[in-house]
Amino acid sequence: MGKSVAILGAQWGDEGKGKIVDLLTDRVKYVVRYQGGHNAGHTLIINGEKTVLRLIPSGILRDNVTCLIGNGVVLSPEALMKEMGELEARGINVRDRLKISEACPLILPYHVAMDHAREAALGKNKIGTTGRGIGPAYEDKVARRGLRVSDLFDKEAFAEKLKDILDYYNFQLVHYYKVEPVDFQKTLDDVFAIADVIKGMVADVTTLLHQARKEGVNILFEGAQGTMLDIDHGTYPFVTSSNTTAGGVATGSGFGPRNLDYVLGIIKAYCTRVGSGPFTTELFDEVGAEIARKGNEFGAVTGRPRRCGWFDAVAVRRAVQINSISGFCMTKLDVLDGFEELKICTAYKMPNGEIVEYAPMAAKDWKGVEPIYETMPGWSENTFRVTKREELPQAALDYIKRIEELVGVPVDILSTGPDRVETMILRDPFAA
C-alpha cells in the first residue's frame, strides 16, 4: 500500500523544504505542487551543485519521478519556460516528466505590473510581496475573471478575454497608480509563443493522483512558503495569497483529505521571516546578526535578508493545530553551534498582562506581544554534517527534546547541512 505524505513549512517559510523533498523523492513516483507560484524558492544542493527551483516541483532532479502542478498553483508561463530552459540546459528531462493542471490560473504581465504598483504606493506600509504577480493572480481567480491554462488553447476566445482584463487593469495602472499600461499585442504574442509547449504537458492531475493511490504508489506533496504565511491562518494581512497549510493539499490538487497519511512539518532550529509582519522572537542584536551570517539567511528568490530570532514554540504549536502535523524535520541545527546559551519562546505575554500559549490569529493582536523565554545551555561541539544521532552533543539532544515536549510532536528528521546526504532520518514518513 502506497503512502501519501505532505511536506510543508511550519514557520514563516524558508525552512528548508526543498532539500527534504528532494531527499525523500527516491521513495515516490509523484511529487505535487499544490499552491503558490514562482514566489517559492526551493534550494537544493546535490554533490555540491546548487539548484534553485521556483515553480517546478523539487522531484524533477530524480529521473524516476513525475512532477505535477496542481490547480492551486498560479502559473507564470514565462517563469515556467525560463526554469525549464535552465534545467534542460543541464540535461534534465522536464517535458516528459512534468504534468500541469489545466485549471491553473495564469500569471501574466499585468499581474506583475499591478503587484509592483501597489507595493510602491503603500510605501513603508507595504506587505513585502516578491513582486511576481502572485496576489493579483489569486485575486482574479476569486473574482472569477482570471485566465486559466485551459483558456490558452482557444486563441480567439483568449484574445477577447485578455482584452477585457487588460482594459480593467490598464485603467487602474494609468489613472490611479500613474504608471505605464501593459501592451495587449505583446502580451498576446508572448503567451501564444509558448502555449503549444504548455499544451503538451497538460493533464488531469486529480485523476492521475487517484489512479496512483489505487496502484499503491507513494506520493509526495510539496508545500511552498510556511504556515504562518497562510492567507487564512497566518499573520494577516502580512501573508501570502494561498493556503500554505495541509488543507491546501486537497483544494489545490483534488486529492481527498482522508487519503493523506502523514504530514511532515519543516522547522528551523531557530526562526526567520522575510518581509513585513509580526515576529515576536526577532533579534536585533549581535546574536541575531550572527545567526543570519552563519545560516546564510538571504531569500533564494528575492535575495532579501531574512529577519532572525529564537525558536518560537508558540507559533509552531499553532502550526501543529492547523496541519495535524505527524512529525517534524528540524533543519539548520548546525547554525546554533558555538552559542553559549539558547532561548526558546514558550509563551506570549499580551499587552494586558495575560500569558497565552497559542498565537493570535490577526496581525493587530500581535502588537505589544512579548516573548516569554526558557533559556538552555548551548554547545561548543560541531554538529555540521553529523549524520548519526549518537554523535550529537548532549546539549543539542536536550534542545531538540525540549522543543518536542513544548510542541507535542516528535522530530523525525534532522538536517545538519545543505547537502541531501547531511541528514538523519530517525523515522521515515513513508514507513511511519
From Swiss-Prot:
It catalyses: IMP + L-aspartate + GTP = N(6)-(1,2-dicarboxyethyl)-AMP + GDP + phosphate + 2 H(+). Keywords: Cytoplasm, GTP-binding, Ligase, Magnesium, Metal-binding, Nucleotide-binding, Purine biosynthesis. Mg(2+) binds at D14, G41. GO terms for molecular function: adenylosuccinate synthase activity; GTP binding; magnesium ion binding. Its cofactor is Mg(2+). One of its GO terms (cellular component) is cytoplasm. Its main location: cytoplasm. The active site is at D14 (proton acceptor), H42 (proton donor). GTP binds at residues 13-19, 41-43, 306, 332-334, 415-417. Binds 1 Mg(2+) ion per subunit. One of its GO terms (biological process) is 'de novo' AMP biosynthetic process. Pathway: Purine metabolism; AMP biosynthesis via de novo pathway; AMP from IMP: step 1/2. It is found in: Cytoplasm. Substrate binds at A300, V301, T302, G303, R304, P305, R306. SUPFAM superfamilies: P-loop containing nucleoside triphosphate hydrolases. IMP binds at D14, E15, G16, K17, N39, A40, G41, H42, T130, R144, Q225, T240, R304. Its EC number is 6.3.4.4. Homodimer. Plays an important role in the de novo pathway of purine nucleotide biosynthesis. Catalyzes the first committed step in the biosynthesis of AMP from IMP. Belongs to the adenylosuccinate synthetase family. This is Adenylosuccinate synthetase. The lineage of its organism: Bacteria, Pseudomonadati, Pseudomonadota, Gammaproteobacteria, Pasteurellales.
